[in-house]
């Protein structure tokens, strides 16, 4: 008998980034085109028409007029470059706009066949404005983060999530040309470098992401993601090392996990962090400190989710801290009365602690929700074995022995074994997956009906899966999806 928990596949992706409309761009202390006259005033008028046309039609002719007018003189370079930068951005916002075009395409008559990198040109123009008028940095930043930047950044994120590393790198770097202050592109480049096994480059990009994110709450998600990736990379280095190098790498990986856990807001990833940090302590030769990983959870379990509490309980069990494990599993069960992992592990821990009367009601509940799993019957057998060892009363020993044999045989002779390997719960969806093993001697097709439960045990959805035909001594798989969210557990009737 052992305490178990389902494994976690920890996956992270950056969410899409949004941007404010052109009409929302303003800064009370900045007006680079105030009190202009002549060509600049005319260019400003053409820019207003271009902005209006960009929302309803084609602004190209107005943009070409802006470029012609701002190039027709050298006075007031701040105003000219502000209008020039705006024009580059609006041009890039048009459908099928290319990042590099010939000057003639923009209506420029001087050297018309020469090319212009519009991202670099916009950056150069806005940089001149920012240097001359620092108070305009806010409004130029809003222009820098318009649709061209957004498209490059979200394109980089899409490419990264699709495993297209070259495209992800190119697009992320393109977005940095326009805006080097947001953390998203650095995070993408860090992930690209990590997947290319370039740990040094990945760490450099992740540090830049953290610096860019700072303490701004708008960047909290990317900051948390980056801290997780830094910590995961540390565990990977420790796992790949041996001997003294492994101990040193594991010791170094502990602090990054602590940093991540301090801000973690995802129960699944926090559970993964608990597993990793505790493992790093063990690999570093400091098993005594493992309890520090979950000590805050025992002190205030209501701050944590059931999954992280269960994982912490497993960590406590593996390191011989049974009393801590009981508290953690009990806290998890208080949060979710239908958590199979919490029920199973709490029952197993009670048995290990010779608290058999507390184990039996939990085993009863486990069998009621998961009746076709032979492992559950073995918990009865282990409990009766413990009771047998704890008494010298011959009559009781006979009763306990008979019960042990009964439940052991019941487990061994079950014709089918159903194992749930995935239970994914989302606000608007629930997914269950697993296997059905045919322990019989003839092929068979199985039908299993799952009831999805809320926290009170009320059925919120019923889903049926058919598996088979399954050959003798082989297994078939099932996967069901419910459109109902808010699930806490499941149950099914015995599979025959």
Residues covered by each model-derived region:
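TPR alpha-solenoid repeat register
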Residues: 80, 138-139, 185, 219-220, ...
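Short coil/linker segments at helix-helix boundaries
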Residues: 49-53, 61, 89-166, 195, ...
